[in-house]
Design a protein with these regions (language model features):
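A carboxyl-terminal module marker
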Residues: 668, 672-692, 696, 717, ...
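A general secondary-structure junction signal
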Residues: 53-55, 105, 185-187, 436-438, ...
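Solvent-exposed, membrane-proximal periplasmic/extracellular interface segments of envelope transport
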Residues: 55, 59-72, 687, 692-705
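Inter-lobe coupling/hinge segments of SF2-like helicase ATPases
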Residues: 200-206, 210, 224-660, 672, ...
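A general secondary-structure signal for short beta-strands and their flanking turns/coil
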Residues: 2, 15, 44, 429, ...
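Accessory, non-ATPase domains that flank or precede helicase/AAA+ motor cores in DNA-metabolism machines
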Residues: 1-364, 376-392, 676, 711-715, ...
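A short, contiguous, amphipathic alpha-helix enriched in charged residues
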Residues: 2, 6, 31-32, 658-671
Length: 741
């Protein structure tokens, strides 16, 4: 027999099937998806690869076919359906097959099982008493102590015996040899969630919730599988609807995957699912230990778990009978991978569901333009929930023009209106959230005389000032001491653009010394359980004000929060990205949804320098329809997704001149082969950051009405790049409908 193998080398020229002979000793245990050790190249270097299929026939000269050395015993095998999914992802998004295979295999190495030992008493009550008397007579205190404990509790934890009873291993062995007890071992799964109590709490659903639940249940039980878009305002009870949908699927003996956009959402989301489904729920994220991740994947593979919750990578959970994929907050950009293959979880979920006879539910208060566009075309079933589940009123929104604040002499980042409302909420013993889409103690350093901005020498991005007198590059990690005079003109009038979460925290503490303030951003959430600790502390009312980046306004439910302040609402509005209006609208609308979720009315303050922008106006009015209509006209006029499709050809090289020349040839090739295809080629151009770690970057954008047209173009470009030696020093990647330009 022979095996088709993809070698574990990420090079385009080796991205093909290599056939190997299977030795007799491995024929019974080798299966597709296993990692194997193989001789490769002229020197027969031992490398690893993945078996994609087995065959009885050889496609090459038999005398030249090499033999597999062994199976990689410590690796996790990829299931056949995930191999097929990887092949589809390679075709759709580019990259190599080995990159795609590693993407669909979140856990690559086996981990040693965690074993728990017990001591079990083997004697009858009468025999035990006789033995105890014997040990006491012989003054064998440790043996007597252990046997006495076993008489009271016939099964004892091994660790308790050795630590609490102070009994050594030789004593335990002696009693085992005498037939008094037996040492038993069992495998224990590492559960990353400490609380797992199931509670039957009756939920009274609104008419809107019932309509969605019944519609889904009717479809599912009739065998209809489709993709649903659930557009529900913040607080409308989308999570309760998800759980009822999952219950329908689980009752049919199937499993469900629930994707979340950020690790910060895991704690609250998982607790709600645990209360509903108990320990049949599991969690997967990057902060778990290798052992925890391995245990949860193996439980899912064996069908011991009904629901897997996690970020994008949880999409590849190897459930035996997948019935439903839920993508909560589907508009979030974190669902798009920035690593090759640059897939979008929404598209891969829809494809996996089609293959495995499952349904997909996309949920959001601010659906992505792509999802709503497809729903309007009839590709997705649209459900809408326009009211909050407990009939709370939507928050009152105030838009503050910061230009007027400056004219009135207020140079603080907190407007007079916001300061007034914060004081009011503190007096009322209510909670406040203040968010800023910035990281670090402050922003960039600029000279007020010549305008020079201090940048990273390796990345062409501004350095940010952090506490401790350091200036840091957030792209490559470069650090240098804080400058005291301008390196360009020598002026001492150089300083920070003050807009960082640490800076806001300090200002709030100074302005409201009586307030207890917590901060949540990338710097305060680096440790494993830091998200959980900060969110729990705020939920338990251990703080009055939570200051943070955009992660604090996404999906969290704090009933005591009655005021939300968006401190720099338009900071993301004029980035070099066609999605900037959409992102600003989504962020502000999500922020507005955090206020007034309990029985108290909520208020939101949006601080902006451009109150007339349609994204600001629509978010203040919480009017998705108004925003969508204006935004889709803009996308249609400019030929941007979702109306048309966009492919970014990303090229990188250490030699800037060679990079410019190669990109020119690439563009000429595209224009030469496009024929009658409707293509619009833009560039080559410099991306927002044109150099990272001394590697220069350029990008060519190609627009086309049909996605398939771009896939075919990508395939031909890959062939062109492979046969032309001029591209050997280049790294070229493809990104379809990129989230960032």
């Amino acid at each position: 027999m022979f095996a088709d193998v993809i070698v574990d080398i990420q090079h385009e020229k080796l991205d093909k099937i290599f056939q190997y002979r299977i030795p007799e000793r491995l024929k019974d245990e080798l299966h597709p998806g296993m990692e194997v050790i193989i001789p490769f190249g002229k020197g027969n270097r031992q490398i690893k690869g993945y078996v994609t299929s087995l065959s009885e026939t050889c496609n090459y000269d038999l005398s030249k076919v090499k033999e597999i050395t062994d199976i990689s015993r410590n690796s996790v095998a990829i299931e056949a359906r995930l191999i097929a999914l990887a092949a589809w992802m390679k075709e759709q998004y580019g990259g190599t097959m080995i990159q795609a295979l590693k993407t669909v295999l979140p856990i690559k190495q086996k981990e040693n099982a965690k074993v728990k030992k017990h001591l079990r008493l083997l004697l009858t009550e009468e025999e035990s008493q006789e033995k105890l008397a014997f040990y006491q007579k012989k003054n064998q205190k440790a043996r007597a102590r252990l046997l006495k404990a076993l008489i009271e509790a016939p099964i004892l934890d091994y660790e308790l015996v050795t630590k609490k009873l102070n009994v050594t291993l030789p004593v335990i062995r002696a009693l085992e040899e005498q037939g008094v007890l037996k040492i038993e071992s069992e495998q224990v799964y590492r559960n990353p969630v400490k609380q797992a109590k199931k509670s039957q709490q009756e939920i009274i659903y609104t008419e809107e919730q019932q309509h969605v639940i019944q519609g889904f249940r009717q479809d599912y039980l009739c065998g209809t599988r489709r993709t649903y878009l659930l557009h529900g305002v913040t607080g409308s009870g989308k999570t309760e609807v998800y759980m009822e949908m999952i219950r329908t699927v689980v009752d049919q003996g199937k499993q469900a995957i629930v994707l979340i956009p950020e690790i910060a959402l895991t704690y609250q989301t998982v607790m709600r699912f645990y209360r509903c489904f108990g320990d049949r729920v599991s969690i997967m994220n990057s902060r778990l230990s290798a052992g925890e991740r391995y245990d949860q994947m193996m439980r899912a593979k064996r069908g011991e778990v009904d629901v897997m919750i996690g970020p994008r990578s949880a999409l590849f959970t190897p459930f035996p009978d997948l019935g439903l994929i839920v993508i909560d907050e589907e508009h979030e950009p974190t669902y798009k991978s920035e690593q090759v293959p640059r897939y979008h979880a929404r598209e891969v979920a829809v494809h996996r569901a089609e293959v495995e006879d499952a349904s997909v539910v996309l949920g959001s208060a601010t659906p992505s333009m792509e999802a709503m566009y497809r729903a309007r075309l009839g590709e997705y079933q649209l459900y809408e929930m326009k009211n909050r589940s407990h009939m709370q009123q939507m928050a009152t929104v105030y838009t503050v023009d910061m230009r007027k604040e400056l004219k009135n002499g207020n140079r603080s980042i907190l407007s007079e209106k916001l300061q007034e409302l914060i004081e009011d909420r503190l007096n009322a013993k209510e909670q406040i959230m203040l968010f800023l889409n910035r990281r670090g103690y402050s922003g960039f350093v600029s000279c007020r005389e010549c305008g020079h901005v201090v940048k990273c020498p390796h990345c062409n991005v501004s350095l940010s000032v952090h506490k401790g007198g350091k200036m840091v590059c957030h792209y490559c990690g470069y650090e240098q001491p804080k400058v005291t005079e301008c390196p360009e003109c020598g002026s001492r009038y150089i300083g920070e653009f003050r807009a960082g979460t640490q800076q806001i925290e300090d200002m709030v503490k100074a302005r409201f010394p009586q307030a207890r303030v917590l901060r949540m951003d990338m710097d305060t959430t680096k440790k494993k359980d830091s998200h959980e600790q900060i969110l729990s502390a705020f939920a338990n009312e251990e703080a009055d004000i939570l200051v943070g980046t955009q992660m604090i306004v996404k999906g969290h439910d704090f009933p005591k929060v009655t005021l939300v302040g968006a401190l720099a609402a338009d900071m993301s509005l004029y980035t070099d990205d066609y999605r900037s209006g959409e992102r600003t609208f989504q962020l502000l609308t999500q922020a507005a949804g955090r206020a007034g979720r309990g029985d108290r009315p909520g208020e939101v303050v949006i601080q902006t320098y451009d109150p007339e922008h349609y994204a600001i106006e629509a978010s203040a009015a919480q009017d998705y329809e108004a925003f969508y209509e204006k935004e889709i006209r803009y996308r249609s006029l400019m030929g941007y997704p979702p109306v048309e499709n966009l492919m970014a050809v990303l090229a990188a090289c250490e030699d800037e001149a060679l990079l410019e020349k190669a990109c020119k040839y690439l563009k000429e090739y595209i224009l030469r082969i496009k024929g009658q295809a409707q293509l619009n080629v833009i560039g080559p151009a410099s991306p927002g950051v044109d150099k990272i770690k001394d590697i220069y970057r350029r990008v060519i954008y190609v627009k086309a009405p049909e996605y398939r047209t771009l896939v075919v173009l990508k395939d031909r470009m890959e062939q062109y790049i492979e046969i032309n030696s001029g591209f050997q020093k280049m790294r070229i990647q493809f990104d379809f409908n990129p989230m960032n330009l």
